[in-house]
Amino acid sequence: MGFGGFNGDFNFRGASDHRPLGSDGFLPSLDTNPFLKNHKSVEALDLCKKLHKMGISCDMSIWTKPEEQFRVDPSEFGARTLHGSSGFDQNLTGASQIHDGFRNFSSVRLQNNNFHGVSPSPGEMRLLGRQDSFNLNGFEEMLALKNHRDFLLDQIHEPIKRPPFLRGNDALISSLMFEGNNRVSQTLAAMEASRGFYPEEDSSLLSPFHEKVSGKLGASYLEDTVLIGQGSYGKMSPKSNNDLVSMVEIYGSVNLMAKDQIGCRVLQKLVEEGTFHEAKVILLAIIDHVVELSMDPFGNYIVQKLFDVSDEEQRTLIVSVLTSNPRELIRICLNTYGTRVVQKMIETVKTKQQIALVKSGLKPGFLALVKDLNGNHVIQSCLQTLGPNDNEFVLEAATKYCAEIAIHRHGCCVLQCCISNSVGLQRERLVAEISRNSLHLSQDPFGNYVVQYLIDQQVSAVKLLVQFRMHYAELATQKFSSHVIEKCLRKYPESRAEIVRELLCVPNFEYLLQDPYANYVIQTALSVTKGPVRAKLVAKVYRYGKLHSSPYCKKIFSKTILKK
């Protein structure tokens, strides 16, 4: 407790009015020493009470306004540790052995110090000595501080050794150890330290990998993994096993490890360079989190690596988990990182069972996928990797939603991929549907690319030209469709006479010559036509020679084109 003052003291009137005193004239305890938090003090009068009884007044300035900031000398006091039992608790048992020596030390030290500029009198020194012998709390506290400091000096360079259950928890809350410029070296150092202190516990850390694996396939994996953990496989690399176990100790689980940049790289290396059974262990550890990892910035790489190195049985397990919920699969496909995993899955599936699972998972979300920045690559991967029969579900949907897909930014790319990867009856149906909508598509910012791609594929001109007939002049004056008409002039020789004849019949032909887009159609017609058809076109152009200075007619009236 702090000293407040008593009636008759010369400085009692100067005390602050805002400091409430107890009934006995003393302040509540101001002692915040952490070492006395759980320490019960015996009921006795403290030094201030004794001084008051002797008629000695204390200067209250030491409580109201310290002259300078109080500092603790590190050489005299230690810091209490918070990890388990400290040296403070362990060394209290030796207090009785140096009790007398420390009491003498405290008294001698007080003799050499001034108390606010006044040296203690012999009577006061005797009182202080009695205080030390009567109240053991102050002595035990100082003794504990001294012993604790000595303990810290002895243990400061010793490595921290914790039981396994604490080590796992510390790893989860100490993720900051991987932040900074030297994360790789810290990780490797931790791996070596763990391997050196706890080599006998490697197999016990593999037990979390065995949970939630159902069916005959899961049972066989479980059996193999238990044998791996017990060291029954001669092919199991001890070094690789230690690496995996050490890293799991740091991160807490393989799932958390896969979400870290460094941890994911270590897992990929273990999967790629380790044994077949090590890949099984890692697969079992993440199989319940494969959907989550597929959409993780780092976790997606380990899932892709497992698709590359797994056997057909393991690959079937991963595919079945990813495709079990079509809604979740579509969500993965639309994700920036998940689309890579699904594309890798499509590229590696081989068996009929695996392909059937992929098709059943993707089919419900076809339209959403083709219109998405990430999802459209999944459909294109199917078209480029799977066979014609397996792509039937894609081509059927593309034919059905042809007009809707073709006018979409990403859908037009998918539709072009469908054209190039279709054969036979499927191709004929798709081409017929695109041709039927070609007049509308050729005027669209994205649909015109589909029509142009169809023309480049040497599709029969009859179906397209039927749609364009009587619309050539109109299409020639539009930004997007003018490219389609130019493509027809270049790729379909049989269409040239019909296109030129329709252009020449326009009442206001001079408007075509001055049009920002139609003038390019006229230039292309002059370049590709021959004979009577070209002669009629040149004669028509010469009638409007006065337009040769027009910015859009300069190229048309150039000697190179007209005299070609």
Swiss-Prot record:
Keyword terms, alphabetized: Cytoplasm, Repeat, RNA-binding, Translation regulation
Start and stop residues of the Pumilio repeats: 249-284, 285-320, 321-359, 361-396, 397-432, 433-469, 470-501, 502-539
Domain of life: Eukaryota
Annotated GO biological process: negative regulation of seed dormancy process; regulation of translation
TM segment ranges: none
Cited Pfam families: PUF
Record domain PUM-HD: where: 222-564
Location of this chain's protein in the cell: Cytoplasm
A molecular function GO annotation: RNA binding
A GO-annotated cellular component: cytoplasm
Record's comment describing the protein's domains: The pumilio repeats mediate the association with RNA by packing together to form a right-handed superhelix that approximates a half donut. The number as well as the specific sequence of the repeats determine the specificity for target mRNAs.
Function comment: Sequence-specific RNA-binding protein that regulates translation and mRNA stability by binding the 3'-UTR of target mRNAs.
Protein name: Pumilio homolog 9
Species annotation: Arabidopsis thaliana (Mouse-ear cress)
Lineage: Eukaryota, Viridiplantae, Streptophyta, Embryophyta, Tracheophyta
